[in-house]
A protein has these predicted regions:
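Mid-chain, structured segments of secreted extracytoplasmic proteins
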Residues: 77-118
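Well-ordered alpha-helical segments within folded domains of soluble proteins
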Residues: 57-73, 105-122, 162-178
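Basic phosphate/pyrophosphate-binding loop/patch that engages nucleotide-derived ligands
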Residues: 121-125, 173-198
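Bacterial Sec-dependent N-terminal signal peptides
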Residues: 1-27
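Conserved small/polar residues in nucleotide/adenosyl-binding loops
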Residues: 206-208
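Low-complexity, Ser/Thr/Pro/Gly-enriched N-terminal "stalk/linker" regions
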Residues: 23-92, 127-135, 139, 143, ...
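Extracytoplasmic mature domains of secreted/periplasmic and thylakoid-lumen proteins
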Residues: 111-168
C-alpha cells in the first residue's frame, strides 16, 4: 500500500479517536446561555460592552444587560443577574443620578438602559434605581415632540421620529406605567407606535 495513503489513514484515525474521546460540552446548555457567557467573557465588566473605553450609559449596553436579566429569569443562574447589577451600580451614583447621561440632550437612547432597573428595583428595593427610573420618566414627559405629538429622537434631531426610538421608549413607558400605576402611559406608547406606523409603513416600497 502507498506510504502516503497509510500516513493519511493514520492521521484520520488519530483525529477521529481524539474527537470521540474529547470532553463534550453539555448538550443541555442552550445557545442563549453560550452566547451570554461568551459576551461576559469578552466583556468582563459590562461597561466594556461595544468595546467602550470607559463607563457610559448606552443603549447597546442596555440591550445586552436586559438580555442577561432575561437569561437569569429563564435559567435561575444568578451570574447573569449580578452582571446586570454591576452595570447599573457602576453608572448610578449614591443619589440615584445616572453618570454620563446628559439630560438636556433629550436623547431617547438614554431610556433603553432604564429597562434593566425594574428588575433590580424589584429585587433590592434600592431607591437609587427608582430615582433613576423617575429621571427617565421625567425626560420622556418633557421630550420635544413633532406637531402631531411624536417624540423627537434627540434634541439635535429636530422633528425626527426614529423606529428604534419606539423600541427604546415605548416598552419603558408601558412598564413604568404598569409598575407605578400610571396607565396613561399605555395610551402614550400606543399613540407613538401608531403615529410612526402611519408615517413609515408603505407597501409600495416593497420590491420583489
Amino acid at each position: 500500500m502507498n506510504k502516503n495513503l497509510l500516513k493519511l489513514i493514520a492521521v484520520c484515525g488519530t483525529a477521529c479517536f481524539l474527537a470521540c474521546t474529547a470532553p463534550q460540552k453539555a448538550e443541555t446548555e442552550k445557545w442563549s446561555e453560550r452566547m451570554a457567557r461568551s459576551e461576559m467573557q469578552r466583556f468582563p465588566e459590562p461597561w466594556m460592552i461595544e468595546k467602550a473605553k470607559k463607563p457610559r450609559w448606552g443603549y447597546t449596553h442596555g440591550l445586552v444587560v436586559k438580555s442577561m436579566l432575561e437569561e437569569w429569569k429563564h435559567t435561575g443562574d444568578s451570574t447573569y443577574y449580578e452582571y446586570a447589577k454591576i452595570y447599573a451600580d457602576s453608572l448610578i451614583d449614591a443619589d440615584g443620578h445616572i453618570k454620563t447621561m446628559k439630560y438636556l440632550s433629550f436623547n431617547i437612547d438614554n431610556v433603553n438602559g432604564g429597562k434593566v432597573l425594574f428588575d433590580l428595583y424589584a429585587q433590592t428595593g434600592d431607591e437609587r434605581y427608582k430615582i433613576a427610573m423617575d429621571t427617565l420618566r421625567k425626560q420622556m414627559a418633557e421630550q420635544p415632540r413633532t406637531s402631531e405629538g411624536g417624540f423627537w429622537h434627540k434634541l439635535r434631531y429636530p422633528h425626527q421620529m426614529w423606529l428604534d426610538g419606539i423600541f427604546m421608549a415605548s416598552p419603558y413607558l408601558v412598564q413604568y406605567g404598569a409598575t407605578f400605576d400610571e396607565p396613561a402611559l399605555f395610551d402614550e406608547a400606543t399613540k407613538q407606535i401608531l403615529l410612526i406606523k402611519s408615517k413609515t409603513y408603505d407597501l409600495s416600497l416593497i420590491h420583489i
